[in-house]
């Protein structure tokens, strides 16, 4: 059988070219559900269909939030995890110190990329001077109020207490203010207003610093003297009170809004604190970072997806369809986003927020701090005594963590 010259040349060229290059698969782990997941998957589909993918294909896996951090810790260092994962910055330092988990991305960064984000969100992605992730979305608590009970939100703590007292009737189960004040995360906004914090500038624990004691003394005043707060707060109780019109104001975040759809509510800045020389309440900000896994064999493609996920077009989808607050600062100039009162309120609140510490030692703080909060609100110890005990326990826990 004779083979034409054209066919023969084609066969030779194919042989020289070798086998077709396999499409790169970029596996991404996330913990989104509901509308957040739908918006995220829409961005992923857009990426896969675009020229930006350059032969790569992103596949996603939704991992339950409660199991997410442990799965990353167990799987990624052994090369059994994703190429990219999305999680808040509070575990960042621990994963970096553990090794072989998160790839530093300073090599990939340029001014155009770093300049797209709110500076505080980039700070959250930085550990010991090195950047390890691109900020995707942030979350903060703010003041949420029932418009039928309160014509205008308070701007100061003096105004807050005055308004809350008028709306409080413990016998009827009504309170001017309700929030999970016994939880250290929620309390941090008040603590930070006084200039307090968890660590010193040298990253040493300092839970019992005077400013932290002052913040707790103010909380005790609201609870015991002003009596504007419900006893034994819980997320279920606070949600129930607000939905029933029995709580006029709440300190909470975007996760709370889905639970109060039937209430005519407004959002406003957390008040300034008269007792702290008029400084603002400064909530902790959690930032969802997009991280490239250190063992990934496709780091270039993984970073390319991370960059796409945090660009302006993706931010618009995440904001308007996923109801998230993107770290990309340009999105807030978008007409539809700027006109959205919820997105605008959280954007305003983040201006005075502080990134939650991303040190590995932070994991040693939560339990002692929460115990201290409960001891104080249950009147079992003074703020100073409870914080002294928490400080001692945190120091001991950190020493064990570091093997000393």
Regions found by a protein language model. Name each.
Residues 130-136, 141, 159-205, 220, ...:
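Extracytoplasmic/periplasmic solute-binding protein
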Residues 9-11, 22-99, 111-113, 274-278, ...:
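Conserved N-terminal structural module of periplasmic/extracytoplasmic solute-binding proteins
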Residues 89-140, 152, 157-163, 189, ...:
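Hinge/lid segment of periplasmic solute-binding proteins
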Residues 254-266, 271-371, 402-403:
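C-terminal lobe and pocket-closing loops
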Residues 74, 82-83, 112-145, 175-176, ...:
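A structural signal for short loop-to-beta-strand junctions that line the ligand-binding cleft
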Residues 163-164, 204-231:
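Glycine-centered hinge/linker elements that transmit conformational signals in sensory
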Residues 83-86, 248-253, 266:
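Paired acidic/hydrophobic, glycine-rich loop segments that form the ligand-binding mouth/hinge
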Residues 62-71, 90, 157-159, 230-244:
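Short helix-initiation/N-cap motifs at beta->coil->alpha
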């Amino acid at each position: 059988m004779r083979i034409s010259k054209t066919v023969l040349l084609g066969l030779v060229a194919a042989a020289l070219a070798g086998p077709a290059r396999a499409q790169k698969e970029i596996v991404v782990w996330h913990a989104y559900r509901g509308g957040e997941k739908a918006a995220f998957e829409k961005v992923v589909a857009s990426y896969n269909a675009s020229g930006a993918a350059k032969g790569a294909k992103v596949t996603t896996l939704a991992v339950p939030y409660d199991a997410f951090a442990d799965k990353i810790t167990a799987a990624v260092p052994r090369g059994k995890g994703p190429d990219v994962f999305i999680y808040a910055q509070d575990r960042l330092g621990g994963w970096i110190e553990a090794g072989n988990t998160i790839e530093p991305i300073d090599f990939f960064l340029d001014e155009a990329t770093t300049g797209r984000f709110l500076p505080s969100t980039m700070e959250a992605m930085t550990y010991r001077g090195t950047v390890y992730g691109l900020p995707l979305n942030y979350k903060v608590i703010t003041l949420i109020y029932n418009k039928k009970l309160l014509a205008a939100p308070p701007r100061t703590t003096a105004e807050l207490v005055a308004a809350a007292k008028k709306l409080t009737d413990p016998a009827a189960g009504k309170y001017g203010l309700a929030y999970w004040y016994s939880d250290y995360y929620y309390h941090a906004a008040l603590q930070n207003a006084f200039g307090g914090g968890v660590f010193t500038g040298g990253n040493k624990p300092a839970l019992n610093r005077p400013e932290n004691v002052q913040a707790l003394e103010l909380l005790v005043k609201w609870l015991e003297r002003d009596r504007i707060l419900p006893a034994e707060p819980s997320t279920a109780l606070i949600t129930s009170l607000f939905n029933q019109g029995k709580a006029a104001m709440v300190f909470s975040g975007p996760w709370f809004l889905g639970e109060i759809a039937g209430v005519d509510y407004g959002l406003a800045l957390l008040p300034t604190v008269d007792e702290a020389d008029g400084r603002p309440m400064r909530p902790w900000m959690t930032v969802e970072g997009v991280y490239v896994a250190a063992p990934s064999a496709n780091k270039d493609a993984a970073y390319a997806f991370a960059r796409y996920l945090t660009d302006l077009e993706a931010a618009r989808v995440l904001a308007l369809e996923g109801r998230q607050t993107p770290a990309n600062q340009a999105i807030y100039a978008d007409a539809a986003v700027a006109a959205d009162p919820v997105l605008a309120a959280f954007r305003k609140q983040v201006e005075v927020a502080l990134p939650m510490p991303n040190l590995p030692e932070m994991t040693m703080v939560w339990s002692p701090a929460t115990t201290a909060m409960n001891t104080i609100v249950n009147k079992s110890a003074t703020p100073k005594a409870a914080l002294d005990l928490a400080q001692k326990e945190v120091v001991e826990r950190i020493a064990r963590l570091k093997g000393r």
